[in-house]
C-alpha cells in the first residue's frame, strides 16, 4: 500500500486518487476585497487559472492587479472532484493549488497577467515552491482559449531565455488547454491573507524580469 509520501513528487495514476464527492464545498460567494462574486458565468469577461505555489499569497498577487474582476482560491489539474484542503495536501488528488482569475481584457491584457505570474514565483522547481514541497505546489497555467494557450507558451519560451541567462534551469510549468474543472477551496482559504494579514506567504520570485506585458 502506498503511503502519502509517495505522492509528494508524483501525480497519482488513475485508480490511486481519492474519490472525492459530488457536492461542491460550501462557498460564501462574495469577494472580501471588491465585493464581486467568486462563482458565476462572468459574461463578457475572460478567465484563466494560475498555479504558483501556496494559493494564499498567489491569490493576493492577482486581486491587486487593476482590471482583475475577481479571484478565487481552489484546486485544479487533478482527478478528485470537490477535494478538500487536507485531501489536496495529501498529494492523492493530483490537484495543484490554483487561483481563478477573472479579468476584463479591455482593462488588463493577458500578457500583463502572465508577467505577474512568471515574476511572482520560481517556475523551475518542479513539484515544490520554496519550502512548500508536493505536487499540489507545482507551477501551472490552465487556459480557457486557444489564444491564451499560444500566448502562455510564447511567454514561457521568452522567460526561459531570461532565466537561462541568469543561471536557472528549465521551466517546469504545466501549461494546458482547455482548462480543467476549477474546484473552489473552502471559505477560509478565499482571500486568506486579507482575513489573516500576518498569515503565511511562501511566495517568492527569482528576481528575473519577464520581457512581456511591459506596456500593459
Curated annotation (Swiss-Prot):
GO biological process, one term: protein modification process
Keyword Oxidoreductase: yes
Catalytic function, reaction form: L-methionyl-[protein] + [thioredoxin]-disulfide + H2O = L-methionyl-(S)-S-oxide-[protein] + [thioredoxin]-dithiol; [thioredoxin]-disulfide + L-methionine + H2O = L-methionine (S)-S-oxide + [thioredoxin]-dithiol
GO MF terms held by the record: L-methionine-(S)-S-oxide reductase activity; peptide-methionine (S)-S-oxide reductase activity
Active site annotation, chain numbering: 54
GO cellular component: cytoplasm
Source superkingdom: Bacteria
Signal sequence bounds: none
Pfam family for this entry, one: PMSR
InterPro entries: Met_Sox_Rdtase_MsrA_dom, Met_Sox_Rdtase_MsrA_sf, MsrA_MetSO_reductase
Keywords, alphabetical: Oxidoreductase
Main enzyme class: oxidoreductase
Family to which the UniProt record says this protein belongs: Belongs to the MsrA Met sulfoxide reductase family.
This protein's name: Peptide methionine sulfoxide reductase MsrA
Organism of origin: Xanthomonas oryzae pv. oryzae (strain PXO99A)
Taxonomic lineage from the root: Bacteria, Pseudomonadati, Pseudomonadota, Gammaproteobacteria, Lysobacterales
Gene of this entry: msrA
Amino acid at each position: 500500500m502506498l503511503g502519502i509520501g509517495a505522492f509528494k513528487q508524483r501525480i497519482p495514476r488513475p485508480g490511486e486518487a481519492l474519490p472525492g464527492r459530488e457536492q461542491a464545498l460550501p462557498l460564501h460567494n462574495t469577494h472580501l476585497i471588491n465585493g464581486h462574486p467568486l462563482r458565476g458565468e462572468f459574461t463578457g469577461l475572460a478567465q484563466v487559472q494560475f498555479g504558483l505555489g501556496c494559493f494564499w499569497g498567489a491569490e493576493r498577487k492577482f486581486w491587486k492587479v487593476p482590471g482583475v474582476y475577481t479571484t478565487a482560491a481552489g484546486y485544479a489539474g487533478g482527478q478528485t472532484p470537490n477535494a478538500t484542503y487536507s485531501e489536496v495536501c495529501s498529494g492523492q488528488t493530483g490537484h495543484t493549488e490554483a487561483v481563478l482569475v477573472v479579468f476584463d481584457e479591455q482593462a488588463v491584457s493577458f500578457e500583463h497577467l502572465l508577467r505577474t505570474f512568471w515574476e511572482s514565483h520560481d517556475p523551475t522547481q518542479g513539484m515544490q515552491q520554496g519550502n512548500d514541497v508536493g505536487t499540489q505546489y507545482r507551477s501551472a497555467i490552465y487556459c480557457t482559449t486557444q489564444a491564451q494557450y499560444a500566448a502562455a507558451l510564447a511567454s514561457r519560451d521568452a522567460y526561459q531565455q531570461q532565466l537561462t541567462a541568469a543561471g536557472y534551469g528549465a521551466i517546469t510549468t504545466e501549461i494546458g488547454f482547455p482548462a480543467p474543472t476549477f474546484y473552489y477551496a473552502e471559505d477560509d482559504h478565499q482571500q486568506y491573507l486579507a482575513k489573516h494579514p500576518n498569515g503565511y506567504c511562501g511566495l517568492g520570485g527569482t528576481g528575473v524580469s519577464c520581457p512581456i506585458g511591459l506596456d500593459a
